[in-house]
Amino acid sequence: MVMTDPIADYLTRIRNANMAKHDSVEIPASNIKKSISEILKREGFIRDYEVADDNKQGVIKVFLKYGPNGERVISGLKRISKPGLRNYVSAEDLPKVLNGLGIAIVSTSAGVITDKEARQKNVGGEVVAYVW
């Protein structure tokens, strides 16, 4: 079966594993998924991730993060720009997720970065997802 939106699949696998309180989840790898995983790690939403070679496209193993009492660090993930309806914004129109408590992941000419980094670099791009 052909996957039409691999980024939505990536976010859904993380959301489902998080809701089931799994320690980790394995996801087929791609460069944009590696970039998103790096952002989630840097912003403190996941513990870590590693890329394993499976003689095909590779697999990303994402290690989820929970609080001291088992509460979820990721409250929500939402895909914004979809294959059928792309969402591009200028640097001035970059969204703030929950008044700055969450992040927007933006694919720009400077790479895949957060909304805060895009504001600092004054670049717009495609809003990939919101994480809070």
From Swiss-Prot:
GO CC, alphabetical: ribonucleoprotein complex; ribosome
InterPro entries assigned: Ribosomal_uS8, Ribosomal_uS8_CS, Ribosomal_uS8_sf
Domain of life (superkingdom): Bacteria
Annotated GO MF terms: rRNA binding; structural constituent of ribosome
Family in the record: Belongs to the universal ribosomal protein uS8 family.
Protein's job: One of the primary rRNA binding proteins, it binds directly to 16S rRNA central domain where it helps coordinate assembly of the platform of the 30S subunit.
Complex formation: Part of the 30S ribosomal subunit. Contacts proteins S5 and S12.
Name of the protein described by the UniProt record: Small ribosomal subunit protein uS8
Gene: rpsH
